[in-house]
Amino acid sequence: MCIRDRKYNVYVLSDLAYAEIYFDKKPPPSILQVNRAKEIAVEFTSMSKTYAMAGWRIGFAVGNKKLIEALTKIKSYLDYGAFTPVQVAAATALNGSQSCVSEIRSIYESRRNVLVESMSRSGWNIPSPKASMFAWAPIPKKYQNKGSLKFAKDLMTKAEVAVSPGIAFGEYGEGFVRIGLVENEQRIRQAAKNVRNLKL
């Protein structure tokens, strides 16, 4: 892809915000691993997911020098930089022990496993996500003609389970719901039991 894009003078911006939240010991590849990718690509990552700094608005970009310089210039028009204590916290996280990253990854992987297994017992087969703190789950056959919004509403009213309807993410999200892996395993199991009320 990178070689082809050079021919057409196209740049690639890669969002790798969930780079460290991967499962089954299979980290996602970086576009910058591709030969000559730095000639056309910039990769962004966020401290939000890896270090639980959501809302702190801090991350970094690496890649094509000219694009990074342009990004720096544009950013200077938008703000004056991140609050100093946030920068110090981010530097401390990056330079400190990374055991917390492994721990967070392990917690999300365990929650993912519980979600997939317990929902399957409740009649809803969810493919096992390979990464991130979300499961992108196909809506059951019973709801395919009714849509993701109806399914999400029924989950809320009949099972007391909150999910995001796929349609909220655009037309290609229809047919799916997004489930956050942010609750503990006991709550995930309880949610799966409640899903049985829908008789999927």
Residue ranges and their predicted role:
Residues 4-200:
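PLP-dependent class I/II
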